[in-house]
Amino acid sequence: MVIADASTKLLGRARWLAWATIVYNMIEAVVAIVAGSAAGSIALIGFGLDSIVEVLSAIVIVWQLNGVSEDRERTALKLIALSFYLLACYVAVQALFDLIGQTKPDTSLVGIGLAIASVIVMPILARAKRHTGKQLGSSTVVADSNQTKLCAYISIILLGGLIFNATIGWWWADPIAALVIAALAINEGRQAWKGETCTDSC
């Protein structure tokens, strides 16, 4: 009885962390896309689009925790994988156009603030998910913690690109950061296509 109660409590915590990630990523996506469009920053826009796909991926995690059928889960993961691939193609092509055309994005203080917030929040969420997943014995929750950790890395890349552009005028740092985000999105898509959210290789 005690073990069952502890397991139920841990499962509830895992669900809460998944929903917290969904809500944060939704806010992150809106702010990033609006700020990116205003500043002409493809890195910020790509970051926002990645956050949207991350929301879909997190919803699959919630489904898994609620015992959704494997067939529905596999279908959802395939669609998420395709979304990551489309995102990567769009961001990569736009970043290359910006590099070739030497399109200089404006400084985005909102974008820098968002990136700093994500660099702080994502590692905290990742650690909490990993700890909960290990206690629960759930590879799904542990894998999701790796996905969240990857989001923190993407946030660091975004922050670097935005700061370099704002402080020393390295306009090309923005599209370069966008290309790195596109490459990471391809990796996320590959993992989702294989039926994973992210593996321990992240």
What do these predicted ranges mean?
Residues M1-C202:
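Alpha-helical transmembrane cores and adjacent cytosolic helix/loop segments
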